[in-house]
């Protein structure tokens, strides 16, 4: 990309001129750019453009670990005992982020939105993906509070109820246009489907190991 190479060469020349110790990160350049400069530099300095190439940016979040009601599967490396969600080792980037933020959905989402903006992505259309094992076996109150916190994080303010949070998101600056939940066949029955529809779920993921 000639334009990208030209910009990078200019950055190097400026750094050499002012004897800077290191090249600034793309995110640092974008965060200090004016609105006009940002629009010109965004596509050139954008990291991982595939993340938002479709116009929808995916954010993966994790609930806190809960012990599976059926016991521990032989292939599961995680769990309450090691403070990692079921099916995860604790070394994955999404898991490390969740642990760092105490599994609080609102903090996880806000931090990831900040990162997306810093790297030049447009987070106005989001798809949330709840990973970390079977979400639907967790206590109902925890599920509803978790989902509401997701909408609150995107809306930028707290709503009085889950229904209010979903309604407010329809006109929010950042909108959740897709919502994915991981589950298993035994937690994908009629009552579970009704719950997911109530949460605003648009897609369900079922791991091949459970089939």
What role is predicted for each listed range?
Residues 1-108, 112-158:
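Flexible, acidic/Gly-rich N-terminal and inter-domain linker regions that tether
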Residues 114-211:
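Conserved SAM/AdoMet-binding glycine-rich loop
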């Amino acid at each position: 990309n000639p334009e990208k190479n030209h910009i990078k060469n200019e950055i190097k020349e400026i750094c050499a001129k002012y004897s800077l110790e290191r090249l600034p990160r793309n995110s640092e350049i974008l965060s200090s750019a004016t609105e006009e400069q940002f629009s010109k530099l965004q596509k050139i300095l954008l990291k991982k453009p595939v993340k938002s190439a479709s116009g929808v940016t995916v954010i993966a979040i994790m609930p806190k670990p809960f012990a599976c009601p059926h016991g521990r599967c032989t292939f599961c490396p995680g769990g309450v005992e090691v403070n990692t969600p079921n099916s995860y080792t604790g070394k994955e980037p999404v898991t490390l982020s969740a642990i760092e933020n105490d599994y609080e959905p609102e903090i996880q989402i806000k931090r990831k939105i900040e990162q997306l903006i810093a790297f030049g992505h447009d987070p106005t259309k989001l798809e949330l993906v709840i990973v970390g094992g079977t979400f639907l076996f967790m206590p109902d109150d925890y599920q509803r509070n978790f989902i509401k916190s997701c909408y609150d994080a995107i809306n930028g303010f707290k709503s009085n109820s889950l229904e209010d949070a979903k309604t407010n998101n329809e006109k929010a600056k950042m909108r959740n246009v897709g919502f994915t939940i991981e589950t298993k066949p035994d937690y994908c029955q009629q009552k579970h489907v009704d719950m997911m529809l109530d949460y605003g779920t648009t897609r369900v993921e079922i791991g091949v190991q459970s089939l």
